[in-house]
């Protein structure tokens, strides 16, 4: 359903009982609400959560912001490398405000907040800006600053799909996902293809511009200094990370946990930048512990 949040129209989905424990899920860069693994959602619902998920601004059926344009990512990346300010059309703090607006629209004063990859960065911003609304914070496969990404993956991301057709987008997504998946738990190709096909078809049906991911990349680069602030976070914190993550190196998760008092860090051997079905039950057990379920 569509709601108004932070001055934008956002697409959200709420699952679980009205009296369930509210859990707001914040996805990664360019991710839609359907991109959360079905198995993870099922386990969380079985745990008694009321799950709120959404399409980020600039993604899926949420409001597109193509009128903001896209500054040169190579230029902005170089500026970030030498400590100059990054020209981002919007910030991760704006995206955290989107998430807060969703809770406000639903009449939820407090929630457990969980994010992965870029979503985990937004969760940190959320906890800093809205501690009174944050029952706990779970960061999965994310970083305290700009992620340390393997060079070949960065190069492919800069190249992007060869064109905007479904076939080109699927080929690109398959290649990226095969590069970042868990080496100890490789996702079957048929399951990966079906998952990505569903996501791309939904995005095309929503007539998303395809440039939202670029603006979100700039938001990540702009927020590189977050590591100097997160020591201020005083909410129960869980950090989950795989030690074979080529997209966001495990050092990012370790750094988050080292900077936040009382944070629990759980490292999964052989896990990359995805959600292996084999590890989801253990991940959910950790989430249950941090949320008190």
Could you describe each region identified by the protein language model?
Residues 8-82:
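Conserved HGGG/HGGXW glycine-rich cap/lid loop of the alpha/beta-hydrolase fold
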Residues 83-89, 93-111:
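Conserved acidic catalytic loop of the alpha/beta-hydrolase fold
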Residues 109-148:
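Conserved hydrolase catalytic core segment
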Residues 244-248:
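Acidic catalytic loop of the alpha/beta-hydrolase fold
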Residues 233, 239-241:
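Short beta-strand/loop motif that positions the catalytic acidic residue
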Residues 1-9:
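N-terminal cap/lid segment of alpha/beta-hydrolase-fold proteins
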Residues 152-228, 235, 255:
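Alpha/beta-hydrolase
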Residues 263-293:
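Catalytic active-site module of serine/aspartate enzymes centered on a nucleophile-bearing elbow/loop
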